[in-house]
Protein backbone atom coordinates (compact mmCIF):
# COMPACT_ATOMS: atom_id res chain seq x y z
CA UNK A 1 0.00 0.00 0.00
CA UNK A 2 1.23 3.47 -0.91
CA UNK A 3 1.05 6.33 1.58
CA UNK A 4 0.97 10.08 1.03
CA UNK A 5 2.05 12.27 3.95
CA UNK A 6 1.44 16.02 3.96
CA UNK A 7 4.38 17.81 5.59
CA UNK A 8 4.34 21.19 3.85
CA UNK A 9 2.82 23.59 6.39
CA UNK A 10 4.57 26.14 8.55
CA UNK A 11 3.19 25.16 11.96
CA UNK A 12 3.51 28.73 13.22
CA UNK A 13 2.05 27.99 16.66
CA UNK A 14 4.88 25.55 17.35
CA UNK A 15 7.77 27.71 16.13
CA UNK A 16 8.92 28.07 19.74
CA UNK A 17 9.52 24.31 19.89
CA UNK A 18 10.90 23.57 16.41
CA UNK A 19 11.79 25.32 13.15
CA UNK A 20 10.25 22.54 11.07
CA UNK A 21 7.09 21.12 12.62
CA UNK A 22 7.41 17.60 11.13
CA UNK A 23 10.84 17.31 12.75
CA UNK A 24 9.69 18.34 16.23
CA UNK A 25 10.69 15.56 18.65
CA UNK A 26 8.05 13.99 20.88
CA UNK A 27 9.68 11.64 23.40
CA UNK A 28 12.87 12.06 21.34
CA UNK A 29 11.20 10.87 18.12
CA UNK A 30 10.31 13.42 15.38
CA UNK A 31 6.59 13.67 14.64
CA UNK A 32 6.97 12.55 11.04
CA UNK A 33 8.97 9.50 12.16
CA UNK A 34 6.09 8.53 14.43
CA UNK A 35 3.67 8.85 11.51
CA UNK A 36 5.91 6.76 9.25
CA UNK A 37 6.36 4.10 11.94
CA UNK A 38 2.60 3.79 12.47
CA UNK A 39 2.06 3.49 8.71
CA UNK A 40 4.75 0.81 8.44
CA UNK A 41 3.09 -1.17 11.23
CA UNK A 42 -0.20 -0.93 9.32
CA UNK A 43 1.30 -2.41 6.16
CA UNK A 44 2.49 0.58 4.10
CA UNK A 45 5.57 -0.14 1.98
CA UNK A 46 5.92 2.93 -0.26
CA UNK A 47 5.91 6.56 0.93
CA UNK A 48 5.34 9.90 -0.78
CA UNK A 49 5.88 13.03 1.29
CA UNK A 50 4.94 16.56 0.23
CA UNK A 51 7.28 19.17 1.72
CA UNK A 52 7.11 22.94 1.58
CA UNK A 53 8.06 25.24 4.45
CA UNK A 54 11.65 24.55 5.54
CA UNK A 55 11.60 21.84 2.89
CA UNK A 56 15.38 21.42 2.65
CA UNK A 57 15.68 20.34 6.28
CA UNK A 58 12.66 18.05 6.07
CA UNK A 59 14.01 16.53 2.84
CA UNK A 60 17.42 15.86 4.39
CA UNK A 61 15.79 14.17 7.37
CA UNK A 62 13.55 12.02 5.20
CA UNK A 63 16.48 10.92 3.06
CA UNK A 64 18.19 9.70 6.23
CA UNK A 65 14.99 7.95 7.38
CA UNK A 66 14.77 6.24 3.99
CA UNK A 67 18.33 4.96 4.34
CA UNK A 68 18.12 3.91 7.99
CA UNK A 69 14.77 2.13 7.67
CA UNK A 70 15.43 0.87 4.13
CA UNK A 71 12.09 2.16 2.84
CA UNK A 72 11.28 4.06 -0.37
CA UNK A 73 10.36 7.70 0.27
CA UNK A 74 9.60 9.94 -2.71
CA UNK A 75 9.83 13.61 -1.76
CA UNK A 76 7.50 16.02 -3.57
CA UNK A 77 8.00 19.79 -3.48
CA UNK A 78 5.11 22.18 -2.92
CA UNK A 79 6.23 25.76 -3.55
CA UNK A 80 2.66 26.91 -2.88
CA UNK A 81 2.65 25.66 0.71
CA UNK A 82 0.98 28.86 1.96
CA UNK A 83 -2.22 27.80 0.20
CA UNK A 84 -4.76 25.31 1.58
CA UNK A 85 -3.75 21.69 2.21
CA UNK A 86 -5.59 20.40 -0.85
CA UNK A 87 -2.84 21.91 -2.99
CA UNK A 88 -0.30 19.67 -1.27
CA UNK A 89 -2.48 16.66 -2.05
CA UNK A 90 -2.71 17.69 -5.71
CA UNK A 91 1.09 17.91 -5.99
CA UNK A 92 1.15 14.12 -5.55
CA UNK A 93 -1.33 13.41 -8.35
CA UNK A 94 1.34 12.40 -10.94
CA UNK A 95 2.69 9.77 -8.54
CA UNK A 96 -0.49 8.05 -7.35
CA UNK A 97 -2.83 6.20 -9.71
CA UNK A 98 -4.05 3.56 -7.25
CA UNK A 99 -5.60 3.55 -3.76
CA UNK A 100 -3.40 5.13 -1.09
CA UNK A 101 -3.35 6.06 2.56
CA UNK A 102 -3.34 9.82 3.24
CA UNK A 103 -1.80 11.08 6.49
CA UNK A 104 -0.73 14.36 8.08
CA UNK A 105 2.84 14.76 9.38
CA UNK A 106 1.56 16.28 12.62
CA UNK A 107 -1.21 13.76 13.40
CA UNK A 108 0.12 10.87 15.47
CA UNK A 109 -2.05 7.79 15.84
CA UNK A 110 -2.43 4.13 16.74
CA UNK A 111 -1.38 2.02 13.75
CA UNK A 112 -4.53 -0.08 14.15
CA UNK A 113 -6.56 2.80 12.69
CA UNK A 114 -4.58 2.75 9.44
CA UNK A 115 -4.59 -1.04 9.37
CA UNK A 116 -8.38 -1.14 9.54
CA UNK A 117 -8.65 1.42 6.74
CA UNK A 118 -6.32 -0.56 4.51
CA UNK A 119 -8.41 -3.68 5.06
CA UNK A 120 -11.41 -1.78 3.68
CA UNK A 121 -9.74 -0.96 0.35
CA UNK A 122 -12.12 -3.13 -1.66
CA UNK A 123 -15.19 -1.15 -0.55
CA UNK A 124 -13.73 2.32 -1.09
CA UNK A 125 -15.33 4.35 -3.91
CA UNK A 126 -13.72 7.69 -3.14
CA UNK A 127 -12.40 8.21 0.37
CA UNK A 128 -12.92 6.63 3.75
CA UNK A 129 -12.09 8.92 6.65
CA UNK A 130 -11.28 7.61 10.12
CA UNK A 131 -13.51 9.58 12.51
CA UNK A 132 -13.55 10.00 16.28
CA UNK A 133 -17.05 9.79 17.74
CA UNK A 134 -15.84 10.75 21.23
CA UNK A 135 -16.93 14.38 21.36
CA UNK A 136 -15.40 14.66 24.86
CA UNK A 137 -11.91 13.63 23.74
CA UNK A 138 -9.62 15.83 25.85
CA UNK A 139 -6.84 15.62 23.24
CA UNK A 140 -9.00 17.49 20.71
CA UNK A 141 -8.59 21.25 20.23
CA UNK A 142 -12.19 22.36 19.73
CA UNK A 143 -11.05 25.68 18.25
CA UNK A 144 -9.17 23.99 15.41
CA UNK A 145 -10.55 20.49 14.85
CA UNK A 146 -12.41 19.68 11.65
CA UNK A 147 -15.93 18.54 12.49
CA UNK A 148 -17.86 15.91 10.59
CA UNK A 149 -21.52 14.97 10.31
CA UNK A 150 -21.91 11.27 9.52
CA UNK A 151 -25.09 9.34 8.75
CA UNK A 152 -25.04 5.58 8.14
CA UNK A 153 -21.24 5.61 7.75
CA UNK A 154 -21.41 8.28 5.04
CA UNK A 155 -20.05 11.81 5.41
CA UNK A 156 -22.77 14.39 4.92
CA UNK A 157 -20.94 17.53 6.02
CA UNK A 158 -17.36 18.42 6.97
CA UNK A 159 -15.73 21.65 8.13
CA UNK A 160 -14.20 23.49 11.06
CA UNK A 161 -17.24 25.67 11.63
CA UNK A 162 -20.01 23.05 11.60
CA UNK A 163 -22.63 23.61 14.28
CA UNK A 164 -24.26 20.22 13.73
CA UNK A 165 -21.75 17.35 13.88
CA UNK A 166 -21.27 13.96 15.53
CA UNK A 167 -17.57 13.19 15.13
CA UNK A 168 -14.11 14.61 14.44
CA UNK A 169 -11.80 14.30 11.43
CA UNK A 170 -8.63 12.44 12.52
CA UNK A 171 -6.69 13.32 9.37
CA UNK A 172 -6.32 9.63 8.49
CA UNK A 173 -7.80 8.72 5.09
CA UNK A 174 -7.98 5.84 2.65
CA UNK A 175 -8.21 7.43 -0.79
CA UNK A 176 -8.94 6.56 -4.38
CA UNK A 177 -7.27 8.84 -6.99
CA UNK A 178 -10.75 10.28 -7.67
CA UNK A 179 -9.93 12.55 -4.70
CA UNK A 180 -7.62 14.58 -6.94
CA UNK A 181 -10.44 15.36 -9.36
CA UNK A 182 -12.71 16.28 -6.45
CA UNK A 183 -10.19 18.78 -5.06
CA UNK A 184 -9.73 20.29 -8.53
CA UNK A 185 -13.52 20.62 -8.85
CA UNK A 186 -13.76 22.26 -5.43
CA UNK A 187 -10.98 24.68 -6.31
CA UNK A 188 -12.51 25.61 -9.67
CA UNK A 189 -16.19 25.78 -8.72
CA UNK A 190 -16.06 26.77 -5.05
CA UNK A 191 -12.67 28.53 -4.89
CA UNK A 192 -11.90 26.09 -2.08
CA UNK A 193 -8.44 24.52 -2.30
CA UNK A 194 -8.78 22.52 0.91
CA UNK A 195 -8.84 18.76 1.37
CA UNK A 196 -12.19 19.18 3.10
CA UNK A 197 -13.47 20.91 -0.03
CA UNK A 198 -12.63 17.81 -2.04
CA UNK A 199 -14.30 15.60 0.56
CA UNK A 200 -17.46 17.72 0.31
CA UNK A 201 -17.55 17.12 -3.45
CA UNK A 202 -17.23 13.36 -2.91
CA UNK A 203 -19.83 13.44 -0.15
CA UNK A 204 -22.37 14.90 -2.57
CA UNK A 205 -21.61 11.96 -4.88
CA UNK A 206 -22.03 9.41 -2.09
CA UNK A 207 -18.32 8.56 -2.27
CA UNK A 208 -17.16 9.75 1.16
CA UNK A 209 -17.31 7.02 3.77
CA UNK A 210 -16.50 7.19 7.47
CA UNK A 211 -14.92 4.62 9.77
CA UNK A 212 -15.22 5.09 13.56
CA UNK A 213 -11.92 4.58 15.41
CA UNK A 214 -13.68 3.21 18.51
CA UNK A 215 -11.45 4.82 21.12
CA UNK A 216 -8.09 4.33 19.41
CA UNK A 217 -5.47 7.01 20.08
CA UNK A 218 -4.87 9.95 17.77
CA UNK A 219 -3.73 13.52 18.33
CA UNK A 220 -3.24 16.55 16.10
CA UNK A 221 -0.09 18.26 17.40
CA UNK A 222 -1.06 21.80 16.50
CA UNK A 223 0.10 23.96 19.41
CA UNK A 224 2.11 23.71 22.66
CA UNK A 225 -0.96 22.54 24.59
CA UNK A 226 -1.55 19.60 22.21
CA UNK A 227 2.14 18.79 22.43
CA UNK A 228 2.06 18.66 26.23
CA UNK A 229 -1.11 16.53 26.23
CA UNK A 230 0.39 14.05 23.79
CA UNK A 231 3.60 13.93 25.82
CA UNK A 232 1.64 13.11 28.98
CA UNK A 233 -0.40 10.47 27.18
CA UNK A 234 2.68 8.75 25.76
CA UNK A 235 4.34 8.88 29.18
CA UNK A 236 1.36 7.04 30.65
CA UNK A 237 1.65 4.36 27.95
CA UNK A 238 5.34 3.92 28.68
CA UNK A 239 4.60 3.52 32.39
CA UNK A 240 1.94 0.87 31.67
CA UNK A 241 4.37 -1.11 29.53
CA UNK A 242 7.22 -0.85 32.06
Predicted segments, located by residue:
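Conserved alpha/beta core of the MobA/IspD/sugar-nucleotide pyrophosphorylase nucleotidyltransferase superfamily
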Residues: 1, 166-242
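N-terminal nucleotide-binding beta1-loop-alpha1 segment
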Residues: 1-17
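Conserved N-terminal catalytic core of the sugar/cofactor nucleotidyltransferase
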Residues: 2-5, 29-99
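Alpha-helix/helix-capping structural signal
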Residues: 9, 53, 112, 177-178, ...
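Phosphate- and divalent-cation-binding pockets in alpha/beta enzyme and binding domains
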Residues: 13, 57-60, 85, 112, ...
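Conserved beta-strand segments of alpha/beta enzyme cores
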Residues: 22, 72-74, 154, 207-209
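Conserved beta-loop-beta/alpha segment of the NTase-like Rossmann-fold superfamily
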Residues: 66-145
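Conserved core of the sugar-phosphate nucleotidyltransferase
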Residues: 110-186
